[in-house]
Every structure is written in C-alpha cells, then in structure tokens.
Amino acid sequence: MEKEEKLEKTNFDVFEDLKRRVRFTRKARIQASKRLRERHEFFEKVSYFYSLLVLIFSVWFLNMGNDKENLVATKILLIFSLSLTFFTMFLNIKNYKERASSFELNYQNLDILLNKIERRECDPESITDEEIKGLHREYEKLLLEKENHLDIDYYVSNKKTREKYASKINQYVWRDRVVKCLVAIYPIIIIFAIVLYTWLNSLLAIHL
C-alpha cells in the first residue's frame, strides 16, 4: 500500500514538473518570436532607409562638375549600394521573419500540449507511467523540431526570472541598442570618413 502511494506521488511530481517545463518553454518561445520579429522589422527598415539614401544621392550627384567631386560621389554611391546588398543578403540568411513564424507555431503547439496536461490534472490519481511518457514524448518532439530559443528569451519570460537575471537582461539590452545605433548611423560614418579622407588628400596635395 505504501509502495503504491509512493508511486502515485512520484508520478504526480513528474507530471507537475513536466507542466512547469512546458509552461516555461512556451513563454520563452513567445519571447523568441517577438525578438526575431522585432529584429526583422528593424533590419527591414534599415534596408528601406539605405535604398532611399541610394536614390537620393543618385539624383543629387548627377552632374557634380569636376572629376574629383564625381569620384567622391561614385565612392559614396558604391558603398551605399554594397551596404544595401549586404543587408538584403543578411536578412535572407538570418531569415528572421520565417523563424519568428516558426516559433509562433511551436508555442501554439506547446499551448495545446499545456491545455491537455491541465485537463488531465483534474484527475491526478489516475495518471499512469505510460501517460506521462507519452506527454514527455510530445514535449520532446516539439523541442526537437524547432531551433532552441536563447537564454535571454527565458530571462524575460516572467517576472521572477526578470528580477533574478536583471543584470544579464540589462547587458543584452544595452548591447542590442549599441548595435542598432551603429547600424542606423553607419551611412553618416561612411560619408564623414569619405569626406575626411578626400579633404586630407586635397590638403596633402596642396602642401606637397
């Protein structure tokens, strides 16, 4: 009798642990989907911005005048065109939008599994080993069929983990902001570098 009670308790504990893991994984993958979709939207806007700059400068640099100005204009347009090509390739390689959709489908399936577990929780005494193994297999299948989420997705998934990993979250947020800022001001940096280089060359040519 004691052995049976111990077995039932163990099964229920395993069942509760599985429910907790499914819930945490679902929340983390919701955050992963949001992160990837936001990343896609940001880089897509950057690509549009670069396309607009290429168009503006292409019109602006028409008939600049002397050969030196035309050379500078050509360099700027070439760099912007290559940057636009790079970002287009980068977006295609990273595939942020499709990966975000994949995570959305995955967490929806995890939600279905979680509902199944919660419905089964109404009668915990009748939970069997085979039933728990079947639920575990469903959970493992959902984990393996998609890429894994990042640690940051787990850190921001609920209030408790946000408080526990606050320093790591802040580090990630600041690093992400710096990267986005550098990407956004990249055209300004390039223009400044080309103008500075051209000015220094002209200055040296005068004094030599």
Task: Identify the role of each PLM range.
Residues R37-S101, Q171-L208:
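Alpha-helical transmembrane segments and their immediate juxtamembrane boundary regions
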